Amino acid sequence: MKNDDLYQKGMEIRRTLHGEESFKKSNTVTYGDPLMTNFIKVATTSVFGALWARPGLDLKTRALVVMISDACTGQEAELHIHMIFALKQGWTQEEISEVLLQLMGYIGAPKIREAMLIAVKVFAEYEASLKSAKKASKKSAKKPTKKSTK
């Protein structure tokens, strides 16, 4: 695949993982700075376009794998992002919690404690975003249509 193709595939995958609103926000807020724009272009091509797009694992499994990697290496900011990806790909809060607890015997309680504290925040944010989206959906469904008066 050419770099342009990898970049486009990476953009599709990032959009899928983030969701449209979060994807747009990350591109303008997090990656709006020229330095960060260069970072995300390379990451979109080489990580999302080349690695996440590989055959053999679905996005749901890949989201869990990177979340586990972040917990094991203490990458707290990335863990936050990838935990949201895992939730959006269908992993439940209970499954994510159990995965983290399973890791405790292998990477230690301190790292898992930090990961669990992040999970508390992520789960609360995720629940709030679901409620907000549901509320917005109900509002838009209730809006009366304007009748034309001729």
PLM region spans:
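Preference for long, well-ordered alpha-helical segments
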Residues: 95-119, 126
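Short, conserved micro-motifs enriched in small and acidic residues
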Residues: 59, 63, 110
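Short gly/ser-rich anion-binding loops that grip negatively charged ligand groups
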Residues: 55, 69-76, 105, 109
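Short alpha-helical scaffolding segments that buttress acidic/His motifs in well-ordered protein cores
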Residues: 43-47, 64-69, 99-106
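Mid-chain, well-packed structural core segment of small domains
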Residues: 64-67, 71-97
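Acidic, glycine/proline-rich low-complexity segments that act as flexible tails and inter-domain linkers
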Residues: 1-59, 88, 114-150
